[in-house]
From Swiss-Prot:
GO terms for cellular component: cell body; dendritic shaft; dendritic spine; early endosome membrane; excitatory synapse; intracellular membrane-bounded organelle; plasma membrane; postsynaptic density. The modification Phosphoserine is found at S137. May regulate AMPA receptor content at nascent synapses, and have a role in postsynaptic development and maturation. Residues 203-228, 250-258 are extracellular. The lineage of its organism: Eukaryota, Metazoa, Chordata, Craniata, Vertebrata. It is found in: Cell membrane; Early endosome membrane; Postsynaptic density membrane; Synapse. One of its GO terms (molecular function) is glutamate receptor binding. The chain crosses the membrane at residues 182-202. Residues 1-181 are cytoplasmic. The keyword Metal-binding does not apply. Pfam families: CD225. This is Synapse differentiation-inducing gene protein 1. Belongs to the CD225/Dispanin family. Residues 229-249 dip into the membrane without crossing it. It comes from Bos taurus (Bovine).
Length: 258
């Protein structure tokens, strides 16, 4: 019965040893480091010299079963050396004693940026890193502003508005039909020099006919001629009336002297 129990315990230990070998560098059960030559103790201390295992040492028991290697505790000081032997050559592990002077030497070439919140300067003063304050008068404070001349833009807007108004007036003039000046023609025909008045009246009718046909060019030409003849008729008629009045006054004055 005891042999069966020892055999089962041996099988369990074998399984645990295989699992620990797959797990990596450290055998958590037997507490030995795995190397190419076998299992080597990781403790250099004198008190553990008797517990070192140089190889896969196994002793036969009374029942013929193999005994597992002796268990040892882990020495943390040798962990780094064991890990370094397993890493690639391009990965180098340095101790803190080596990194500290290196960091002190490089610190002079580095620049550190610190962000501080809610540290706005007081009114009319600025805070410097050494804790000193400097007072600034309103004359010393310079505010950089950017300005540009807007006169050219205003002139451009005025020219654009003038051009647009002229264009609209020209468009309205072209769209509006020419005037026939019929009333002025009738007045020149009845009250002024009637031959020119009759011609102006005739041209005013021609203007209406051209507008009805849609010939605005002919209508505008007839309208200008009618206006010219009507004004000329009024001018001549006014001159005739003034001449007749002067002649009548002169005749009456001569008759009174007689």
């Amino acid at each position: 019965m005891a042999g069966v129990v020892e055999q089962k315990s041996g099988l369990v230990r074998d399984k645990l040893g295989e699992a620990s070998k797959r797990n990596g560098l450290i055998n958590t059960r037997s507490l030995v480091a795995e190397s190419r030559d076998g299992l080597v103790s990781v403790y250099p201390a004198p008190q553990y010299q008797s517990c070192r295992v140089v190889g896969s040492v196994a002793s036969a028991g009374p029942d013929g079963a193999r005994n597992e290697p002796l268990q040892q505790l882990l020495d943390p000081s040798t962990l780094q050396q064991s890990v370094e032997s397993r890493y690639r050559p391009n990965l180098i592990l340095y101790s803190e004693s080596v990194l500290r002077p290196w960091g002190d030497g490089v610190a002079a070439d580095c620049c550190e940026t610190t962000f501080i919140e809610d540290r706005s300067p007081t009114k009319e003063s600025l805070e410097y890193p050494d804790g000193k304050f400097i007072d600034l008068s309103p004359e010393d404070i310079k505010i950089h502003t950017l300005s540009y001349d807007v006169e050219e833009e205003e002139e451009f807007q005025e020219l654009e508005s003038d051009y647009s108004s002229d264009t609209e007036s020209e468009d309205n003039f072209l769209v509006m039909p020419p005037r026939d000046h019929l009333g002025l023609s009738v007045f020149s025909m009845l009250c002024c020099f009637w031959p020119l008045g009759i011609a102006a009246f005739y041209l005013s009718h021609e203007t209406n006919k051209a507008v009805a046909k849609g010939d605005f060019h002919q209508a505008s030409t007839s309208s200008r001629r009618a206006l010219f003849l009507a004004v000329l008729s009024i001018t001549i008629g006014t001159g005739i009336y003034v001449g007749v009045a002067v002649a009548l006054i002169a005749y009456l004055s001569k008759s009174n002297h007689l």
